């Protein structure tokens, strides 16, 4: 009778700090800013903590005196401009940077083999950056209707980019490796 016993442990340490602050000026507008700093054992021994900033701001134009006193304010009840920017990081998985061995059983014996996905010691943290600019508009369609008194519209433009994306790339069959990170 053959018994197979396996054990798997992934030592992994991660911690971070988050700081954020919001300031509003009545109902006219506001802004917030902050950052998050993360450290992970998956970053590698020589790596430093990664910091990701964020911020947003809005201006409710419909609250300004020049807008409230205009003829358009009876139809456009709410008009807000907004913008936001932020960065986020995705860390490599534990051991994605280091050569590892997998275990298996061949017949009645144990075997070690290299995994099909080759590690990459040059992996960095994947960082996504996003900018969003938008507006919110509320229209008053008239109080005489029993329904559909108002309509709200929101529009946004956003752009996201990613640096150091982590994904598997097929390797040449002659390399003996299936994929490389």
Language-model features: locations:
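Extracellular/periplasmic, surface-exposed regions of secreted and cell-surface proteins
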Residues: 1-181
């Amino acid at each position: 009778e053959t018994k197979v016993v396996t054990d798997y442990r992934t030592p992994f340490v991660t911690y971070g700090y988050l700081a954020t602050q919001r300031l509003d000026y009545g109902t006219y507008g506001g802004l917030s800013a902050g950052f998050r700093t993360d450290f992970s054992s998956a970053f590698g021994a020589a790596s430093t903590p990664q910091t990701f900033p964020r911020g947003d701001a809005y201006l409710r134009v419909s609250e300004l005196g020049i807008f409230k006193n205009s003829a358009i304010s009876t139809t456009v009840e709410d008009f807000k401009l907004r913008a936001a920017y932020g960065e986020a990081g995705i860390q490599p998985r534990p051991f994605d940077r280091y050569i590892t061995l997998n275990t298996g059983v061949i017949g009645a014996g144990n075997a070690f083999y290299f995994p099909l996905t080759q590690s990459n010691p040059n992996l960095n943290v994947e960082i996504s950056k996003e900018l969003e600019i938008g507006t919110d508009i509320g229209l008053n369609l008239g109080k005489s209707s029993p329904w559909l008194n108002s309509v709200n519209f929101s529009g946004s433009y956003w752009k996201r980019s990613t640096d150091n994306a982590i994904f598997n790339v097929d390797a040449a069959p002659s390399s003996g490796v299936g994929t490389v990170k």
